[in-house]
């Protein structure tokens, strides 16, 4: 069985050993837990963003960058691919762990979830569970975790705290922008899972999304990074699943009730209460599917350059 934690550990060790080259900072706490700051007190960068995103995917995804443009505006794009979509996206990358300890709060993702089974139902659905003495977690937070936080995470993972590694980046940072946009494929896989589709039938996946400019405000940064996928995420899925025809029209974001406005505006209208937002909005803009059993192709959704540029501040 593939170990997402063992694969991610190799990437983490590279970040830690060459922290200066990556514009990040390595810290080892008194209890032996290891942390790489990718944007809290350091600039980070594209190389760090690639490593952070690949760690989130449990070492089962590949990340690249390119320059593209939306209408007349040039901007960077992320490209993500994986040959293990269910495990890498749902079993690792999904931000399925709310980390709380004392006054500390962070959204947790990455392969450590596969040890702590956060949430357990996800791993039952995809039929995956990791076995590893080491754990690697990715934390989306403005602050680095202390020893108490790392102790709690290690306990939930069932490992010794000195074998726990964490990468940390704020939403409002370059690495933060990169890693959230790097979830473009995950949003498609997650949406299909929520619709009741067996995501283990997806054999390969690839996606791209624009990387938005970093906002000074964390809530606005959350808006732009979500909009990158909601309004301009383009995904290609390869699968053996003739029954995909029953799910097609519900995949893209333009089928949700909140579609058509930048996410920050929707969030503000909902009094910044996530529970008032139609969760079907968290989907890619456009998806193509190659169904191998019958050799058919499908295309749903479309990008929305105007809302994307408005969200990013160019309109």
Curated annotation (Swiss-Prot):
The lineage of its organism: Archaea, Methanobacteriati, Methanobacteriota, Stenosarchaea group, Methanomicrobia. It catalyses: 5,10-methenyl-5,6,7,8-tetrahydromethanopterin + H2O = N(5)-formyl-5,6,7,8-tetrahydromethanopterin + H(+). It comes from Methanospirillum hungatei JF-1 (strain ATCC 27890 / DSM 864 / NBRC 100397 / JF-1). NCBIfam families: one_C_mch (TIGR03120). It is found in: Cytoplasm. CDD domains: MCH. GO terms for biological process: methanogenesis, from carbon dioxide; one-carbon metabolic process. Its EC number is 3.5.4.27. It comes from the Archaea. InterPro entries: METHMP_CycHdrlase. It holds the Pfam family MCH. One of its GO terms (molecular function) is methenyltetrahydromethanopterin cyclohydrolase activity. GO terms for cellular component: cytoplasm. Pathway: One-carbon metabolism; methanogenesis from CO(2); 5,10-methenyl-5,6,7,8-tetrahydromethanopterin from CO(2): step 3/3. Catalyzes the reversible interconversion of 5-formyl-H(4)MPT to methenyl-H(4)MPT(+). Belongs to the MCH family. Keywords: Cytoplasm, Hydrolase, Methanogenesis, One-carbon metabolism. This is Methenyltetrahydromethanopterin cyclohydrolase.
């Amino acid at each position: 069985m593939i170990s997402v934690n063992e694969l991610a550990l190799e990437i983490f060790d590279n970040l830690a050993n060459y922290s200066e080259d990556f514009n990040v900072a390595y810290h080892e706490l008194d209890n032996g837990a290891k942390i790489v700051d990718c944007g809290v007190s350091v600039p980070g960068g594209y190389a760090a963003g690639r490593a952070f995103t690949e760690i989130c995917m449990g070492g089962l995804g590949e990340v690249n960058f390119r320059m593209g443009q939306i209408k007349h505006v040039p901007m960077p794009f992320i490209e993500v691919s994986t040959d293990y979509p269910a495990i890498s996206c749902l079993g690792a990358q999904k931000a399925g762990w709310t980390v709380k300890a004392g006054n500390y709060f962070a959204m947790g993702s990455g392969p450590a979830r596969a040890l702590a089974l956060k949430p357990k139902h996800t791993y039952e659905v995809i039929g995956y569970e990791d076995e590893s003495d080491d754990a690697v977690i990715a934390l989306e937070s403005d602050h680095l975790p202390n020893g108490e936080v790392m102790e709690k995470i290690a306990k939930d993972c069932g490992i010794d705290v000195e074998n726990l590694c964490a990468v940390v980046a704020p939403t409002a940072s370059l690495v933060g922008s990169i890693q959230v946009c790097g979830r473009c494929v995950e949003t498609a896989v997650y949406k299909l899972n929520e619709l009741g589709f067996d995501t283990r039938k997806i054999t390969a996946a690839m996606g791209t999304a624009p990387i938005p400019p970093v906002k000074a405000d964390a809530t606005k940064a959350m808006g732009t990074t979500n909009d990158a996928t909601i309004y301009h995420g383009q995904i290609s899925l390869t699968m053996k699943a003739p029954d995909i025809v029953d799910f097609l029209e519900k995949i893209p974001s333009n089928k949700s009730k909140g579609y058509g406005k930048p996410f920050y505006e929707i969030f503000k209208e909902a009094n910044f209460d996530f529970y008032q937002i139609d969760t079907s909005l968290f989907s890619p803009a456009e998806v193509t599917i190659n169904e191998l059993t019958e050799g058919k192709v499908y295309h749903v959704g479309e990008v929305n350059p105007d809302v994307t540029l408005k969200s990013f501040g160019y309109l």
